[in-house]
């Protein structure tokens, strides 16, 4: 009987001890990530990072050139006797422009000098030759200073009329006409002018080896609209390039053409080539016979009207 009582007493004591241990075990489990979870507030460094992110301005997109929904909304200023423009979106290959972009023509003037350079370089490469340093200096002057005498020299050396005929056939121009033995009087539509620009950009004109050199040289045209010194030193850095947002200027190559005709006024063409687009503006207008300020402002205006800032 005494043994049974002792066993019962021991059993009761053990049960009591186990009941006392349960709350302690639960506390340890909670501390190890059990059902009871306590989240501590973020530390000072994390809170600072979150505040910095929240204070950042919303991202913005850079301005760009784009075709307008209504091409007819791009209008010339009063006084122009001819006005046409065309815009090629390189992402789609679509050309849009003025109603006369495929029918109205202007004399190409110095705009065609980039082709004269490209044609010479491509043909030289095809014959396994390399231009001399003197030739490259000539071609550079022809583009950045719009040197007429050098243009005439290379035009004649490469075949005269054949130079422009190759321009038409290689660049797929459909409404451009050769003026016999006179490169500056080549008649070209705005639509063909952007095709010509694309031909320069995609390597067809100068070939793979010399296209980067040509486009880079066209980014360094010198002289403002008032810098018309002589036929060998003419300022051609004006027009479309002056109407572009600053972010687009470094990647844009240009070649303008301009001549004043007694009785007919200025014949002016502006060509700009960017990796995303090609734009040309053609205009005839009366004005100062020395400085083509009025037509230059027309080209500038078209570029500004085509500039948009995308929305996020």
Protein language model regions, located:
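Penicillin-recognizing serine hydrolase domain
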Residues: 4-5, 27-90, 156-312
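A short glycine/serine-rich beta->alpha loop
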Residues: 99-106, 179-183
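Amphipathic alpha-helical segments within well-ordered protein domains
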Residues: 121, 151, 194-198
């Amino acid at each position: 009987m005494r043994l049974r009582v002792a066993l019962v007493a021991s059993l009761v004591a053990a049960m009591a001890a186990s009941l006392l241990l349960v709350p302690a075990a639960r506390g340890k489990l909670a501390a190890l990530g059990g059902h009871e979870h306590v989240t501590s507030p973020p530390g000072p460094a994390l809170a600072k990072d979150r505040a910095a992110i929240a204070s950042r301005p919303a991202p913005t997109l850079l301005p760009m050139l784009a075709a307008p929904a209504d091409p007819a909304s791009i209008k010339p200023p009063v006084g122009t006797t001819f006005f046409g423009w065309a815009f090629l979106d390189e992402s789609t290959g679509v050309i849009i422009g003025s109603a006369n972009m495929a029918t109205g023509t202007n004399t190409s003037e110095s705009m065609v000098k980039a082709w004269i350079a490209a044609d010479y370089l491509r043909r030289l490469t095809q014959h396994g030759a390399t231009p001399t340093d003197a030739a490259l200096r000539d071609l550079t002057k022809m583009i950045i200073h719009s040197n007429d005498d050098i243009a005439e020299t290379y035009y004649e050396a490469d075949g005269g009329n054949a130079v422009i005929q190759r321009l038409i056939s290689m660049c797929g121009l459909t409404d451009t006409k050769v003026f016999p033995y006179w490169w500056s009087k080549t008649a070209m539509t705005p639509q063909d002018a952007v095709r010509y620009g694309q031909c320069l950009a995609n390597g067809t004109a100068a070939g793979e080896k010399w296209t980067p050199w040509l486009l880079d040289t066209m980014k360094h045209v010198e002289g403002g609209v008032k810098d018309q010194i002589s036929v060998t030193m003419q300022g051609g850095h004006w027009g479309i390039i002056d109407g572009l947002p600053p972010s687009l200027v470094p990647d844009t190559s240009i070649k303008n053409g301009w001549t004043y005709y007694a009785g007919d006024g200025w014949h002016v063409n502006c060509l700009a080539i960017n990796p995303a687009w090609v734009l040309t503006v053609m205009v005839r207008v009366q004005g100062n016979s020395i400085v083509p300020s009025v037509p230059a402002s027309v080209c500038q205006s078209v570029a500004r009207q085509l500039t948009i800032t995308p929305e996020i």
